[in-house]
């Protein structure tokens, strides 16, 4: 089972996923972003669904995205060095950059950050302000 973002998901779908996992199906997700921004404000993201399933079943679902260990391991195993990681989420982008010993830049995109924004090396108001920091 691969969990990706859907605009709407209901408890029936979550229970069906949980039943399949209990029946032995493997599960992984694209990302664990709790929310995602829309023109009308934030909506529950893929991570909100993943968190429900993890808590209901007492499991940890691996992710293909930042900052999961699979993703970090790929960079480390292939000697890929990043000078900067730029993103709008502390819990994914900034955490990922920190794990790779990169300088981290948090862009205030309007996404609620549930982690301390002081975890980022640099905090800026818009992506256009990033350029002076990296060049």
Where are these regions (language model features)?
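Asp-based, Mg2+/Mn2+-dependent phosphohydrolase catalytic module
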Residues: 2-135
């Amino acid at each position: 089972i691969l969990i990706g973002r859907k605009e709407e998901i209901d408890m029936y779908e979550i229970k069906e996923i949980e039943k399949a996992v209990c029946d032995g199906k493997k599960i992984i997700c694209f990302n664990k972003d709790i929310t995602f921004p829309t023109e009308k404000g934030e909506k529950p993201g893929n991570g909100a669904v993943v968190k429900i399933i993890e808590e209901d079943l007492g499991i940890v679902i691996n992710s293909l995205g930042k900052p999961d260990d699979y993703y970090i391991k790929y960079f480390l195993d292939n000697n890929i060095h990043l000078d900067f990681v730029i993103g709008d989420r502390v819990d994914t982008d900034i955490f990922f950059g920190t794990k790779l010993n990169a300088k981290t830049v948090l862009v205030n995109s309007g996404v609620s950050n549930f982690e301390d924004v002081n975890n980022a090396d640099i905090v800026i108001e818009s992506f256009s302000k990033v350029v002076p920091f990296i060049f």
